[in-house]
Structure formats: C-alpha cells, structure tokens
Amino acid sequence: MIEQQQFGQSRICYDSEWVSSPELALFDPQYWQAQNKVVGSATGRGTTWFVQLPKITAALRHYRRGGLFGKLVKDHYWFQSWSATRSFAEFHLLKQLREAGVNVPRPIAAYAMRKGLFYQADLLSERIANAQDLVTILQKHSLSAELYQKIGVEIAKMHRVGVNHTDLNIHNILIDAQETIWIIDFDKCYPQAGDGWKQENLDRLKRSFNKERVKRSIHWHDKDFHALLTGYESQQ
C-alpha cells in the first residue's frame, strides 16, 4: 500500500510492503553506515548507496543537478507541489510502469524536504540483483540478436504505457543473470501522448551506442540496432 507521512517541512511517500516504519533517517547514508547495512555504492552524478532493508536491497539516490547550472545550484529545485517533486514523480512513474508489466525497479520510498521556495529530494528504489548495464557488458563481449530483440520488446512495453524516457541510453538498460532486461533512471521522465517522441527515444539510444563505440570500443555494430528494432516493432 502506498502511504505518505509528514515530518514538519519534509514528506515521505512509501510502499508499506517494504517500509514498515517511515523515518527521515532512511534517506541518510550515515544512518545506514552506522547500522552496517551499506552493501555497495556506485558513482555517477553523485554517489548511489546500496543498502540492505529487512526484505529488499535498495538503491539510495540523492537528486543532483547536472551541467553548468548544477555547479551553481547542486541539489535545490523549485517547489510547486509535493507530487511534482522529482522523487515523488519518479516513485509514482515506477509504480505505474511496474503495474503495466514493464521491468523497472520497485519504488520503495520517496523523500522531499521543502526549504522556502525550494526543495531537496531522495529516492529509495530496488537494486536489481546480479545485473550489469549494457556499457559494462559490451566492453567485454557482444550480445546475441535475441537479447537485442528482448531489449526492443522492453522499450516497446514502456512506450505502450505512454512513458517518455528522456534519457534513454545504454547506461540505463541492465541485463541480469537470468537475461531479463531492465530499464532504470526515470528522473525527469513523464507520461506523454502521441508517438513522435518515441522515435526520439530510439534515436537517442542509437546515439548512445555510437558514442560508447567510439569512447570505450564496445562490441556493437549497426546490425545490432536492427535486431533491437525487430523486437520493438514486434510489439506494435
């Protein structure tokens, strides 16, 4: 069950299946370190902490800005409403996608703290076990046409729900030990009507493959994208 709880100028939205006692400490990496529950980390725009909850392993991420503006205003966003905060929006989008059968992480808890006209935010979501992103995998070996088709199918499922993944790239697509395809990182993504943006998602993904082929010499060829599109079009 999805519930919310207010703590002064802070609010938590959470799934009571995974969080029985919502508290602000859940979003503090030092709390998890003191409990000896940090099981790993990953570094990107900031540090994502992997923490062990009683029934699930979670990824704790603090929302940070990127680009030049992010150097000036690192983690403050304009407050409009609780539902419009980055964390709450991503939480509910993940819930919508999972209910539609798309392979995305379970949303566990979202946090936002209002500071006057601005807010800061964090998200706890499921850590996908035994999974690697496409960049990591393709630096080691190529993928079969069948796996590329499965990637295309998963993207098509997301599009059928009407969700625009505005940062669809090969860092945000995972494959686990069972060869299940997962799509992650839905910050700033949103539901959208129409179809034109779907091709924009695919074009962005193809640019990502080409970029990493030059940058990291990944094992990827143009024919692999045709296999991905075959899977995608099979769902249309």
From Swiss-Prot:
Its EC number is 2.7.1.166. Belongs to the protein kinase superfamily. KdkA/RfaP family. One of its GO terms (molecular function) is kinase activity. It is a peripheral membrane protein. This is 3-deoxy-D-manno-octulosonic acid kinase. The gene is kdkA. The active site is at 167. InterPro entries: KDO_kinase, Kinase-like_dom_sf. Transmembrane segments: none annotated. Its main location: membrane. Pfam families: Kdo. HAMAP family: KDO_kinase (MF_00521). It catalyses: an alpha-Kdo-(2->6)-lipid IVA + ATP = a 4-O-phospho-alpha-Kdo-(2->6)-lipid IVA + ADP + H(+). It is an enzyme of class 2 (transferase). It comes from the Bacteria. The keyword Cell membrane applies. The keyword ATP-binding applies.
